[in-house]
Amino acid sequence: MRAERWSQTVRQIRSPRALRVIPLTALMLISGCGEKEQVSSATPPPDVGVYTVRAQALTLTTDLPGRTSAFRVAEVRPQVSGILQKRSFVEGAEVKLGQQLYQIDPRTYEAQLRRAEANRTSAQNLARRYETLLKTKAVSKQQYDDALAAWKQAEADYQVARIDVQYTRVLSPISGRIGRSTVTEGALVTNGQAQSLATVTQLDPIYVDVTQPITKLLGLQKALESGRLQKTGENQAEVSLTLDDGSAYPLPGTLKFSEVSVDPTTGSVTLRAEFPNPNRKLLPGMFVHALLKEGVQNAAILVPQQAISRDTRGVPSVWVVKADNTVESREIQTLRTVGNAWLISNGVTEGERIITEGVQRVRSGIAVNAVEAKNVNLVDGFAATTEASAN
């Protein structure tokens, strides 16, 4: 039975009708594959947004934390002893150089001054009389010299007594803002006491002390020496200030000096800037951020942050659209962030196009349809003063 069925099947396959159907089916399959290949080859290149790289002069700055310190600080102390009779200032007010702050009881010192004045007059008269007698040799030269020395000593005692009387009027040693008084009327104060009577602080101008890692300072010096950076000017470096609440201080300052030694515990060097402070907005001890101009890079290239990707090793790269509209991945070397972009040292050149939109749709070697990117807005990219924070 099985042998008969098999023979019947073979006869059907070998029949002319079956032989005509098989080539037709194969032809339809081949035709279908060709249509799929034509559809695939007709797929348009993906759209990508590109940013055209440009080079331009860029002023580089560095943001350093710091604290304000007073331009001058003077502790008011008594130079004579006595009972404090009067306080002549309002706590927290502005005082001038030489303005009277306190009055110490002067009566004892005025009496000593009168006694010193009498002794001076007596010594002066004796010396002049001996001078006359010396001409007639009524007194010896030694007696005259002793009288003359006594006169000079009496004169010195008089001057000391006069100064002590002046010291009973305690004056402000500098101009500035005076703090609270640590003593009241009726208190006994002494010359050389440890506690000051008050403190006067000069707030205009005011210092800002910032610290910079020595490695960054050395790198800046090398960049200036090599010519990669140009000095911003021949005068003192300009510094701008940001307060702790994020607001900008309106008046610029100047960098005065850097410390001559490095802190061995932190590896940092202290820089001091001076700021005008006419409205007394800055007070000693405030935490601030100082923005220091480092120099000008004449052919700086900025790359938007969204154009940069990193591999598993952390190496940054960008997708570059070549002249034939094909793309390639290219490694770059980043230096620092500038606003919302990266300053790079190599990898791409001016005029090249890098992809910032549609990165996920590209692979190396494919053709793309490059249009101007809409997601690029380099904040403060090439402004005259660019806020750059060192890595």
UniProtKB/Swiss-Prot annotation:
InterPro entries: CusB-like_dom_1, CusB_D23, MFP_Efflux, RND_pump_MFP. Residues 1-32 form the signal peptide. A lipid is attached at C33 (S-diacylglycerol cysteine). Its main location: membrane. GO terms for cellular component: plasma membrane. This is Toluene efflux pump periplasmic linker protein TtgG. It comes from Pseudomonas putida (strain DOT-T1E). It is found in: Cell inner membrane. It is a lipid-anchor. The periplasmic linker component of an organic solvent efflux pump. Involved in export of a number of organic solvents, including toluene and styrene. This is the most important solvent efflux pump in this strain, although it can export AMP and some antibiotics. GO terms for molecular function: transmembrane transporter activity. One of its GO terms (biological process) is response to antibiotic. A lipid is attached at C33 (N-palmitoyl cysteine). Residues 107-136 form a coiled coil. Pfam families: CusB_dom_1, HlyD_D23. Belongs to the membrane fusion protein (MFP) (TC 8.A.1) family. PANTHER family: ACRA/E-RELATED COMPONENT OF DRUG EFFLUX TRANSPORTER, MULTIDRUG EFFLUX PUMP SUBUNIT ACRA-RELATED. Induction: Constitutively expressed; the ttgGHI operon is further induced about 4-fold by toluene and styrene but not by antibiotics. Keywords: Cell inner membrane, Cell membrane, Coiled coil, Lipoprotein, Membrane, Palmitate, Plasmid, Signal, Transport.
